[in-house]
Design a protein with these regions (language model features):
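Cytosolic regulatory regions of ion transport systems
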Residues: 1-215
Length: 215
């Protein structure tokens, strides 16, 4: 369990708060809008109405005591940038800020953000891959170069073992696990035989995934 400070309760911030709560983390939620704060009260540990661009308000939250600080302010990049910078000045351990464009990400990283989230960009990429393919069932982007996909077993792999196929050496990807009938098995070995009713959980560089699985 981690302690989380979440600033900005728009649609993304609200959904993030709900997910963090489901994962069992303690969440302090902050927004200027009283209605948004009240809506989030049922699924956060605590919530406050306040202006995150005011250093005295942020200082009163004890930002250095949180494991992670999220800045998910929408519609006002200047406020997001100022909040990010102030959090770091006040000793925040780890700051994740929301960006909509690459240029915003650059400014945020230069002004205190340890990481940047692109919710719209990441969702768009996932949706483009997932819903234009009959054989890709899930896509998780780890960074600009790497991803994990859930993919149907290629026809020429069916009935053969991972060791026989020599997948890691020939394809440059790693089989993390297999799924069958909705159940995931991560205890795969070179002896694991791949069948048509399975899907594979595959980690690799994007260029290798595109080459071997037609992303």
């Amino acid at each position: 369990m981690k302690t989380v400070l979440l600033i900005g309760l728009g649609r993304f911030g609200r959904h993030l708060a709900m997910q963090l709560n489901e994962l069992g983390h303690q969440v302090m939620a902050v927004d200027r809008d009283e209605e948004r704060v009240n809506e989030c009260m049922p699924f956060v540990t605590n919530a406050q109405i306040g202006d995150s661009t005011r250093v005295d308000f942020l200082r009163s939250l004890g930002v250095s005591n949180y494991d992670v600080c999220y800045v998910t302010i929408s519609g006002n990049f200047q406020n997001s940038l100022e909040t990010t910078s102030l959090l770091k000045e006040l000793g925040a351990k780890y700051v994740v800020s929301r960006a909509e464009r690459d240029v915003q990400a650059k400014f945020l990283l230069r002004n205190g953000a340890d990481a940047v989230a692109y919710p719209e960009k990441q969702l768009a990429k996932w949706a483009a891959i997932r819903y234009t393919s009959n054989h890709i069932f899930s896509y998780i982007e780890l960074d600009e170069q790497h991803a994990i996909i859930e993919v149907a077993v290629p026809e020429d792999w069916q009935g053969r073992s991972i060791g026989e196929l020599d997948i890691r050496r020939k394809c440059g990807v790693n089989i993390l696990g297999v799924k069958r009938n909705g159940k995931t098995d991560v205890n795969v070995s070179p002896e694991t035989v791949l069948d048509a009713d399975m899907t594979l959980l595959v980690l690799g560089e994007n260029q290798e995934l595109k080459k071997h699985f037609r992303l």
